[in-house]
């Protein structure tokens, strides 16, 4: 696995861990002892093994990103949180760590999500050319839905939804258009009237009287796509689902990503084709500076990523492949699968070369 970033060119790292097989085969908590005691206790507070594994994977991803991005020893890492009420995980180097480090420790921005045994992280290094790195507690003290604290400050959000999880846990998943409409209406405080109508109407993809399973299934995928988009955006700002402007944030031109093809049928490690055509509106005005995309993983998962600031927003979209036009390098890295034994264990146990100075 390559380094997290090229520090001179901000890029968006995106990693994920799939804990499903771990939960089936391993009742233990690998590398738990490599976390700080408070993080170990947080993992063990979960009752179900799969929830423990997701919490563990979330911590391991955060530690790995901090370790690789900031080039500090694993055992010196500690996770901080932004002020109440949001309590967003962040990294604030302690004065002792800063004094003991020869090189300046770069500021970083990251966000994590977990759902149905999958855990994902999106993160970036704050460019050092912009002077002193801002303190995350300051950046997210007063979250703004419409703008970054400063153009040089990146903000990222990521979210995972699972279309199949409701089917697996209950027998009450909607099976008709009327049931779908009733289910969607439960979330009237989250979605705008236009978004609710679009979901109920299946985005105009099916006839108004279509009642078959395919139509309802698409409606559920569309609902979870909207949910992932909204979560990714508000997490990018540092807010939560309690944000008072939730219904004023609207997404249009939304298409539920098709389930990813089976392995060997053109898919890249079970990933579908990212959809980037979503338009964002806030208080009725078009949001132009945010880049957002959704992509399907396997048949049941939908990932959404949002970013703005420091060249990672809308301006970071790669150029088209029109004849005679060079294709720019995409600053958004593809989703990369992280293996606990292969990728994390060497760093967590101190045998990696991440903190060694290059000759």
From Swiss-Prot:
Activity is inhibited bythe antifunfal copmpounds PD 404,182, 6-nitroso-1,2-benzopyrone, and calmidazolium chloride with IC(50) values of 3.9 uM, 35.2 uM, and 19.2 uM, respectively. GO terms for molecular function: holo-[acyl-carrier-protein] synthase activity; magnesium ion binding. Disruption phenotype: Leads to the loss of the green conidial pigment and decreased viability of conidia. Impairs virulence in both insect and murine infection models. Disulfide bonds: none annotated. PptA is a druggable target in Aspergillus species that can be targeted in a selective way. Its combined role in both primary and secondary metabolism, encompassing multiple virulence determinants, makes it a very promising antifungal drug target candidate. Its EC number is 2.7.8.7. It is an enzyme of class 2 (transferase). It catalyses: apo-[ACP] + CoA = holo-[ACP] + adenosine 3',5'-bisphosphate + H(+). Belongs to the P-Pant transferase superfamily. This is 4'-phosphopantetheinyl transferase A. The lineage of its organism: Eukaryota, Fungi, Dikarya, Ascomycota, Pezizomycotina.
């Amino acid at each position: 696995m390559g380094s997290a970033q090229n520090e001179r060119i901000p890029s968006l790292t995106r990693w994920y861990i799939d804990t499903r097989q771990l939960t089936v085969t391993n009742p233990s908590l690998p590398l738990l002892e490599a976390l700080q005691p408070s993080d170990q206790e947080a993992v063990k507070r979960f009752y179900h093994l799969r929830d423990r594994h997701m919490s563990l994977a979330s911590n391991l991803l955060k530690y790995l990103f901090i370790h690789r991005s900031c080039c500090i020893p694993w055992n010196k890492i500690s996770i901080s949180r932004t002020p109440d009420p949001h309590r967003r995980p962040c990294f604030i180097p302690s004065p002792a760590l800063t004094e003991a480090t020869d090189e300046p420790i770069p500021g970083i921005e990251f966000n994590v999500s977990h759902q149905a045994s999958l855990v994902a992280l999106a993160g970036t290094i704050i460019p050092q050319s912009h002077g002193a790195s801002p303190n995350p507690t300051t950046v997210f003290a007063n979250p703004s839905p419409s703008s970054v604290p400063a153009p040089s400050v990146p903000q990222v959000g990521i979210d995972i939804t699972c279309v199949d999880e409701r089917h697996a846990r209950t027998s009450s998943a909607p099976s008709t258009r009327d049931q779908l409409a009733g289910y969607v209406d439960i979330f009237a405080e989250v979605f705008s009237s236009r978004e609710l109508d679009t979901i109920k109407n299946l985005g105009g993809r099916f006839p108004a009287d279509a009642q078959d399973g395919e139509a309802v299934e698409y409606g559920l995928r569309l609902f979870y796509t909207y949910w992932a988009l909204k979560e990714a955006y508000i997490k990018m700002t540092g807010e939560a689902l309690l944000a008072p402007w939730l219904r004023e944030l609207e997404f249009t031109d939304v298409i539920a990503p098709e389930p990813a093809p089976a392995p060997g049928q053109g898919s890249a490690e079970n990933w579908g084709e990212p959809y980037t055509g979503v338009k964002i509106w806030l208080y009725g005005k078009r949001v132009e500076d945010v880049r957002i995309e959704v992509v399907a993983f396997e048949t049941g998962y939908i990932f959404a990523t949002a970013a703005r600031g420091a060249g990672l927003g809308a301006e970071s979209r790669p150029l088209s492949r029109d004849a005679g036009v060079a294709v720019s390098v995409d600053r958004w890295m593809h989703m990369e699968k992280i293996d606990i034994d292969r990728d994390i264990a060497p760093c967590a146990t101190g045998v990696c070369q991440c903190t060694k100075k290059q000759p």
